[in-house]
Design a protein with these regions (language model features):
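Polytopic transmembrane helical bundles with strong interfacial aromatic enrichment
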Residues: 1-237
Length: 237
C-alpha cells in the first residue's frame, strides 16, 4: 500500500508543480491578486504532497518493507534505527526525493516572504520558475528514479546500506548540503524573474538574504563532507 500511496502523492506533486508554473504565465493575462492566492495555495499543496511522500518512504524503511525495491537495495533488518532513517537519502532515488522536497520547502518559504509581497510581479514569476524546476525534477524521478518501485516477489532480507555510508555524518551531511545547493534556486529564480518583469531593480535586494542563508548551509555541508571524507576515505594520509 505504501508504494501505491507514494506514487499518488508524487503525481499530485508533479501536477501542482506544473500548475504553479502555468499560474505564473497566466498572471500576464489575469488579475495578479487572484494568481497570487492561487499559486500560494498550490505551493502549500506541493510541499504537503512531498512531505507525505518522504514520510511514506521513511515508514517503508522503518517497517523493513522489502517489497519496495529501493528499501531492499539500501536496508536490512539489522540496520540501526538512525541509519534506516538516513538510508532514505542514502541512494540515488531517495536523494533525489530529498532534493525536490527541500526545493518545495524553499519555495514555500519564499511564498511567505513578507518583503517580497511588495513586488507581486517578481514574487509570482519567481514562484512560477521554481515550479518549473520542481516539475523537471519530479518528472525525472517518476520516469527514471522512482523510489516507490515494487519488487515482487519481495525478499526476506535486504542488501543493506553501503558500509562507507554507515556513519553519523550521513544523517547530517546530505540534508545540509542539499539545503545549500537547492536554496540557491531562490536567488536564481529572482534573477530570472527580474528579466520578465518591469520593476526589475528590486530583485538583488530581495535575493540577498536568501543567498546568504543558502551559502551558510552550503558552507556547512561542504565542511562536514570534507571532514567525513578525511577520516572515512583516508584522504588525510
Amino acid at each position: 500500500m505504501i508504494p501505491e500511496l507514494g506514487q499518488v502523492f508524487l503525481v499530485a506533486a508533479l501536477a501542482s508543480a506544473l500548475l504553479q508554473f502555468l499560474g505564473g504565465i497566466g498572471s500576464f493575462s489575469r488579475k495578479i491578486e487572484n494568481m497570487e492566492a492561487f499559486i500560494e495555495r498550490i505551493t502549500v499543496f506541493q510541499t504537503f504532497s512531498l512531505l507525505i511522500c518522504f514520510g511514506l518512504l521513511t515508514t517503508a524503511f522503518l517497517q523493513n518493507d522489502f517489497s519496495v525495491l529501493y528499501v531492499a537495495s539500501n536496508s536490512n533488518t539489522a540496520l540501526p534505527f538512525a541509519y534506516k532513517v538516513a538510508a532514505v537519502w542514502g541512494g540515488h532515488e531517495g536523494s533525489l526525493l530529498l532534493w525536490v522536497l527541500i526545493l518545495s520547502i524553499w519555495t514555500f518559504l519564499l511564498s511567505k516572504d513578507r518583503a517580497l509581497k511588495s513586488s507581486p510581479d517578481l514574487r509570482i514569476q519567481s514562484l512560477s520558475i521554481l515550479g518549473l524546476i520542481s516539475f523537471g525534477f519530479l518528472l525525472f524521478i517518476l520516469y527514471t528514479s522512482n523510489p516507490f518501485e515494487r519488487l515482487l516477489p519481495s525478499p526476506f532480507q535486504g542488501r543493506g546500506l553501503n558500509p562507507l555510508l554507515q556513519d553519523p555524518a550521513l544523517v547530517i551531511h546530505p540534508p545540509t548540503l542539499y539545503a545549500g545547493y537547492v536554496g540557491l534556486a531562490v536567488p536564481f529564480s529572482l534573477a530570472v524573474s527580474s528579466l520578465l518583469t518591469v520593476n526589475n531593480h528590486q530583485w538583488a535586494m530581495h535575493a540577498r538574504s536568501w543567498t546568504i542563508l543558502s551559502w551558510v548551509f552550503l558552507t556547512g555541508g561542504i565542511a562536514l563532507g570534507s571532514w567525513w571524507a578525511y577520516y572515512e576515505l583516508g584522504w588525510g594520509g
